[in-house]
Amino acid sequence: VADIGLPRDATYWVGARATGSAAPGGATSASLTGQGQTLATIPGTTPVRVTTVVDLGATPRRLRPGVFLDDGLAVELAPGGRLRRLLDAAAQPGVSWAIDPALLAEVTDMADGYVLWAPPTSIPGTGVEAAKAWLAAYRALPAASGVQTLYGRPDLVGALGAGATAVLDRTQAATAASGLGLPVVAVATRVDAASLAALGRRSVAVVSPGVAATSPWALIGDAAVAGAETFEAPIRSPLIGDSPATRADVAVALARATGAQVRLVRTPDAAAI
């Protein structure tokens, strides 16, 4: 960097082109045979604060205590499954995590034995041991690195838009009844002015990929909001293409541009970035 006079603490396009000619001696004009480029971020002296939050949540599958719709949750909890891999990522040093108490209630129920709904009868579930192992690993997570989300993660934008103002009250009551004793943060895919105002009045902080990640925390209305990056969507630029490596390059470049970054990890692939 110093040799070519480029300042540090900046992001640059770096690429290479290969040209060639099939004619002896290069008698004809050379043509492009290949090219590649990527983003390269040169760190400065000021460290960039990056907070990684592993999101432990899943689509509900419990119909009533001890009865589940299917064994989809068992697949996610088993070794190599999405939730197992996310839990392993949450256990890494310096990583924060957020758990939906509704998920924890379902896994706890599974670990005690459960059946699958198969009218007019039921069949035994197969995920008891996977649930027990997952719970043991979850209980080993450092509590100081964790928060809990609102129970069941309701769509507050849709609920408040439909006039169902009691949804948030019921959700907060269920969250408190879970007894986890962790700080509460609303992890929401989408937010609007009404939902942020309602959460702000209840002093519930918000982490959302639906808010521009221009700073780690911002006050929007009365709510403390962290705009998060998920890096789940493919990179559609023809200049660099899409791969785990290019997503990592983009993540670093965005972090340098804003000075800080909250990464919300919801998939094992995103955990690798």
Segments the model singles out, each with a brief description of its role:
Residues 55-57, 99-102, 150-152, 188-190, ...:
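Active-site-proximal beta-strand/loop segments in catalytic clefts of secreted hydrolases
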Residues 30, 34-143:
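Active-site beta->alpha N-cap acidic-glycine motif
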Residues 63-65, 106-112, 158-161, 193-200, ...:
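A short acidic (Asp/Glu
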Residues 139-156, 218-224:
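Short, compositionally biased "basic patch" segments
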Residues 147-177, 235-242:
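Glycine-rich phosphate-binding "P-loop"
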Residues 12-17, 97, 149, 186, ...:
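Primarily hydrophobic membrane-targeting regions of prokaryotic envelope proteins
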Residues 1-51:
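Extended acidic/polar, glycine-enriched regions
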Residues 85-95, 176-273:
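Catalytic grooves of carbohydrate-active enzymes
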